Amino acid sequence: MFSGSIVALVTPLDTDGEVDYTSLKNLVDYHINAGTDGIVAVGTTGESATLSVEEHVKLVMKTLEFSDGRIPVIAGTGANATHEAVTFSKLFRDSGVAGCLSVTPYYNKPTQEGLFLHYKAISESTDVPQILYNVPGRTAVDLLPETVARLAEFDNIVALKDATAELDRIAITRELCGDKFIQLSGDDATALEFVKMGGHGVISVTANVAAKDMATMFALAAQGKFEEAEIINQRLMPLHQDLFVEANPMPVKWATHRLGMITHPDIRLPLTELSHSAQPVVEQALIRAGVLK
């Protein structure tokens, strides 16, 4: 259902801070032409935390419109209030999205029981396939494998995006949840190793600027051609690392603009445009990876 290279798509904005739908269409077409396996619209890389509900919904619907059935679209639906996450999930119930990606509630630090009840409420509100998203470095809460296993009992909770970079969790989660439960890496630098150890793919920041390479790498991995995949991975490693030189999505937003993929590098406060000191770092990463000549 979900595998390969899925891009955590940036949300292009104009100089007034409004969504730039012309650039969005260009990004969607770029990923379709590059062979990207799926698009996450309005995930955390897409600045979900600083968009209004109306903007959020319109962005997902426009992404669906622009994709026109040519690529699976996953809607970001996470929130730190359960009722809000439920509302998003209901809004996309009949939209045509392939699934919903819901980050763990951030800042309020729920217990494992709170996380279970949060996702249970979401699951019971919709029949759309749900992807859990664990990124404790950003949320200050860790969705443990034992809790994932409880949630995997719900028919429409089908996958986990794991951004912990703790590769030992793959086997633990597979043992608890079974082989059919989908595990996706949320950490580009360790994503290929994640797949070697039994994962199914990646939800990627790097794919924003190196879509064809990422799609090729994970297609090779799916065929067991890990040596060939590793050659690509090593070339892309500067991006995997330096696209996080400052808080995501600041570097990747600047990088997509530097490559001419979006019209403006603007980003919403409290995030700011990539600092002048970090811009050469990202530019050199683009050059070393072979995506900027």
Curated annotation (Swiss-Prot):
| SMART domains reported in the protein's UniProt record | DHDPS
Record EC number: 4.3.3.7
**Alphabetically ordered keywords of this record:** Amino-acid biosynthesis, Cytoplasm, Diaminopimelate biosynthesis, Lyase, Lysine biosynthesis, Schiff base
- Residues annotated to bind pyruvate: T45, I203
The active site consists of Y133 (proton donor/acceptor), K161 (schiff-base intermediate with substrate)
Question: Where along the sequence does the record put site: Part of a proton relay during catalysis?
Answer: T44, Y107
Query: What coarse category fits the chief subcellular location reported for this protein?
Result: cytoplasm
Q: Give the subcellular location.
A: Cytoplasm
Name the Pfam families on file: DHDPS
GO BP annotations of the record are:
diaminopimelate biosynthetic process; lysine biosynthetic process via diaminopimelate
Which GO-annotated molecular functions does the record name? 4-hydroxy-tetrahydrodipicolinate synthase activity
Q: Which InterPro entries match?
A: Aldolase_TIM (IPR013785), DapA (IPR005263), DapA-like (IPR002220), Schiff_base-form_aldolases_AS (IPR020625), Schiff_base-form_aldolases_CS (IPR020624)
Function comment: Catalyzes the condensation of (S)-aspartate-beta-semialdehyde [(S)-ASA] and pyruvate to 4-hydroxy-tetrahydrodipicolinate (HTPA).
Q: What is said about its interaction partners and assembly?
A: Homotetramer; dimer of dimers.
Q: What PANTHER family does the record point to?
A: 4-HYDROXY-2-OXOGLUTARATE ALDOLASE, MITOCHONDRIAL (PTHR12128:SF66), DIHYDRODIPICOLINATE SYNTHASE (PTHR12128)
Q: Which HAMAP family match?
A: DapA (MF_00418)
What this protein is called in its record is 4-hydroxy-tetrahydrodipicolinate synthase
